Amino acid sequence: MKKISLPKIGIRPVIDGRRMGVRESLEEQTMNMAKATAALLTEKLRHACGAAVECVISDTCIAGMAEAAACEEKFSSQNVGLTITVTPCWCYGSETIDMDPTRPKAIWGFNGTERPGAVYLAAALAAHSQKGIPAFSIYGHDVQDADDTSIPADVEEKLLRFARAGLAVASMKGKSYLSLGGVSMGIAGSIVDHNFFESWLGMKVQAVDMTELRRRIDQKIYDEAELEMALAWADKNFRYGEDENNKQYQRNAEQSRAVLRESLLMAMCIRDMMQGNSKLTDIGRVEESLGYNAIAAGFQGQRHWTDQYPNGDTAEAILNSSFDWNGVREPFVVATENDSLNGVAMLMGHQLTGTAQVFADVRTYWSPEAIERVTGHKLDGLAEHGIIHLINSGSAALDGSCKQRDSEGNPTMKPHWEISQQEADACLAATEWCPAIHEYFRGGGYSSRFLTEGGVPFTMTRVNIIKGLGPVLQIAEGWSVELPKDVHDILNKRTNSTWPTTWFAPRLTGKGPFTDVYSVMANWGANHGVLTIGHVGADFITLASMLRIPVCMHNVEETKVYRPSAWAAHGMDIEGQDYRACQNYGPLYKR
């Protein structure tokens, strides 16, 4: 099959159409703004898959309806998924704007005195607001000279934030969520809401029973040579932790090998179901070779699978990581327990950053007093106000050990295109694989166990659906925390010490849900959350506004909150504006 092309960014230079001197004097400056914008975006951004971002510039400057239509025809033929309109001057507002109702759009009006770029910006945004097609405003803080071709830092920040979020919107559109199984243990996020995916994300849901995974394994609908490669890789790289099961439930070497083999097969088959695998045509499995065009997936597992077959922990952890037996590659998005709403938060984080995402239970709030009582240790530094224990048996990406390093040598999680094989090996070396606890997983399996290094900035997110309101997004920026080993051991052994742990300290504001760490835990909307590397809450906020998903909780500085200009007309409190605007405009792909 022909590979689906990646979305491009359309650049629309608009101009004052009056000939006999006005337009002619502005052509070069206007087109240079478009070229400078395209150069910035192609230099600074990549798609989540690692491919270079492409920009498509209108063949001519746009002065009115005819040239706007010609530009639209070009964009439609080149898979443009978002647009940025640029101008240094007055132009004719509603005649020149991008009217596509679902394509994210921004307008950069040059802040100069010679020509009124700001006046066009205001006029065009007024037209967008009146027509119900929200657009983002970009206007530099400081006046520039007419011949200044540089892009100021504040303008650059908005251009990049808009483009990152817009590319995420465009990349999700038309893809599918693979729901492998049904509802896991009554977890609401695994009650997959087709309307949410269709109306807010522009995605389909592909529902497949877990017997399809069983069929593929039993009927050998996979690449047998790759399975041998995967087993050899695991033999070389896997370190095994203690078996905490009672003697009667411990497996011998032959049984353990069978569990490992099936766990790796699950990873291969889930991957093939998501994206397809042309090698399956070689064994006569053309239909299965196509996959389901899934950009994200979830695996129910518990309990209808895990009561008799190996659990999904190994498969999910490997798929969500940035590497496997084939080397470093783009991480997949696979949600434990088919928690589709946590899967969407993972998908957002991956699309915005290109990095692996850490899926976790938001398990326990530990107050400073409670930790001192049970360990004798007094918390300090980032942890002084208490910490949240993030831990789950399943799909935490191994990148979450933070054994990768940034340019200054600090622990981090990198976009996959920046990860070296040595860093991938370091993450594997920091991970132990512990036999699954029989009481939870009667069919066996292996859980990854690692401890996230401390002092790393993270953003924790979660999507929830509220009846009568729709989807909402929660955001909590903070840091991982490193505890003394003896303190970690005491706390970890009070829960399940065979699972991966991140000790998380959210940044507090002293207000609302961020009054203290307890309040963050108390206001979290579900049992799961996602960690994305960096303090990227502002990007999540911009993305959510494009999709019309209100943010019900965040600790991002107000100066970094960037939403469409029409939000300002929905009241004076910016979070109330968000709710009213999202309700007014409705989901991006209204159904």
Curated annotation (Swiss-Prot):
GO cellular component labels: cytoplasm
Record's keyword terms, sorted: Carbohydrate metabolism, Cytoplasm, Fucose metabolism, Isomerase, Manganese, Metal-binding
Location(s), subcellular: Cytoplasm
Binding residues for Mn(2+): E337, D361, H528
Matching PANTHER family: L-FUCOSE ISOMERASE
NCBIfam families documented for this protein: fucI, PRK10991.1
Protein name according to UniProt: L-fucose isomerase
Organism of this sequence: Escherichia coli O17:K52:H18 (strain UMN026 / ExPEC)
Organismal lineage: Bacteria, Pseudomonadati, Pseudomonadota, Gammaproteobacteria, Enterobacterales
Gene designation: fucI
